[in-house]
């Protein structure tokens, strides 16, 4: 099972065509908040008397669709006594986003049990029975939803790695399993931009061209002619590129002069092949109010840039596609002065699209 979010920015130099920033295949957050925020903004428009404008806010059923995806996976496991496991940290700052999903699962399917466990819980109390089912606290686990486990800090000891291996070896449906987890790496994004790669997965020329139009140029940094050329491009014009490692969770990328400094440090080091050099996207500016805890009241009208996220769910079994659908959308807005758009870090805000055409 895969719950993903593909993120896009408009490229000003290409007539504001949407360009893919990245795709997230593990712990793609804010799927529930995006639905709640859409309903909130509809309510605000109604209270302010802008009844005719409500239709300009597109429906967003991301929360319901995500919950239905988990229920579908739970049913495929074919054991009504089994539970869906949310893998979390001991302290989870984004717990509200997770709880909405849990509550929606219970609302749509009261029979479905949801439990929250940590890596440490799995390591200490989890085990595989003779059918390779994952059992913890006498409960069989049918679906594992990874909300953690995507950064090295989540694996401080071998205990966490052993717990991850136990879960991967189990018959539980993983969201995602290790294969889908690795698909979200930046090197995979780079490979998909190469000529002939999309043709391995798509056959219709129009679809191939539409997908390829969303790509920006991405360069590998291997020790070959192309890699050396990419290094020189970054050194000569660092403001036009983003340097990205194989990391998730935000705050890992390099921009502007940091690109040059990092490239100088590792241009002769084998570590450089673990990075990609991505053409930078310069989105158009719009005006908006950014409301944040502890911020000015009332908030000032400021320049913002907005990133679109499209959610999707994929469920497959033995090579057969059972569910493959777009489930919802998200807008994250931030100051153009901020390179990262982290919501929890306070450098961005959740937003909604308002359609004009």
Spans of features found by a protein language model:
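Domain-scale recognition of functional cores that engage charged ligands
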Residues: 9-15, 24-356
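Extended, Lys/Arg-enriched charged tracts that mediate electrostatic binding to polyanionic substrates
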Residues: 1-10
């Amino acid at each position: 099972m895969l719950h993903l979010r593909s993120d896009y920015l408009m490229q000003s130099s290409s007539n504001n065509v949407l360009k893919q920033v990245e795709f997230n295949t593990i712990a793609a957050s804010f799927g529930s908040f995006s639905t709640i925020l859409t309903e909130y903004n509809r309510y605000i428009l109604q209270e302010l008397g802008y009844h005719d404008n409500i239709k300009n806010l597109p429906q967003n059923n991301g929360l319901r669709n995500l919950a239905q995806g988990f229920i579908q996976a739970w049913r495929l496991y074919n054991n009504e006594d089994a539970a869906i496991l949310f893998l979390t940290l001991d302290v989870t700052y984004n717990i509200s986003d997770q709880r909405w999903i849990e509550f929606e699962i219970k609302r749509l399917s009261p029979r479905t049990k949801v439990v929250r466990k940590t890596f440490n819980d799995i390591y200490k109390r989890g085990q595989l029975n003779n059918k390779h089912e994952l059992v913890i606290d006498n409960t069989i686990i049918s679906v594992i939803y990874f909300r953690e486990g995507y950064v090295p800090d989540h694996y401080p000891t071998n205990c966490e790695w052993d717990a991850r291996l136990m879960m991967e070896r189990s018959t539980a449906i993983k969201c995602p399993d290790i294969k889908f987890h690795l698909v979200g790496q930046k090197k995979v994004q780079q490979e998909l931009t190469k000529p002939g790669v999309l043709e391995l997965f798509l056959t219709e020329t129009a679809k191939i061209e539409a997908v390829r139009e969303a790509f920006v140029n991405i360069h590998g940094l291997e020790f070959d002619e192309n890699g050396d050329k990419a290094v020189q491009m970054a050194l000569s014009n660092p403001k036009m590129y983003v340097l990205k490692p194989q990391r998730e969770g935000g705050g890992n990328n390099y921009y502007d002069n940091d690109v040059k400094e990092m490239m100088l440090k590792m241009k002769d080091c084998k570590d450089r092949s673990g990075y990609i050099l991505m053409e930078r996207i310069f989105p158009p500016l719009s005006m908006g109010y950014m409301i944040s805890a502890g911020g000015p009241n009332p908030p000032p009208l400021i320049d913002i840039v907005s990133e679109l996220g499209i959610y999707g769910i994929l469920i497959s079994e033995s090579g057969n596609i059972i569910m493959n659908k777009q489930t919802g959308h998200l807008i994250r807005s931030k100051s153009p002065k901020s390179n990262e758009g982290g919501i929890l870090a306070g450098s961005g805000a959740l937003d909604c699209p308002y359609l004009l055409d």
